[in-house]
Amino acid sequence: MDPITVILSALAVAGGKVGAKAIQDGYAALRSLILRRFGRSQPKLEERIDDYVADQEPFQKPAEKALRDAGAGTDQEVIDRAVELLRQAEADKPGITGGLVGQINAKGVVVAQTIHGGVHQTIDGSGKP
């Protein structure tokens, strides 16, 4: 699964002020982490995120490009926080993620950019690849 899609979804869902204070706090923490890590190298990143959260459709491409150019999709902490935020939002308001959490939770789905070294993945629980 594309990490930028996950990050954008988390920002859109949680930034829309839907749900509990914990979700709003999670959004603020994710946004802050992204800007802290990548804001200096991408001066328009904050504006792109804020525009996207306010109105997703016209601002999706600029926000996606800014996040990709910044390298946010390769930062595992950012990805993990986005995934957790989506899970919290889905638990608070079932269906709000449009099925994205179900896709993330599905067997065999990995939200990651690059995996270095060997990978052993068991799909059926047997312990056999």
Predicted regions located by residue number:
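Short amphipathic alpha-helical segments that predominantly mediate membrane engagement
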Residues: 1-8, 27-108, 112-129
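Short hydrophobic alpha-helical membrane-entry/anchor segments
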Residues: 14-29
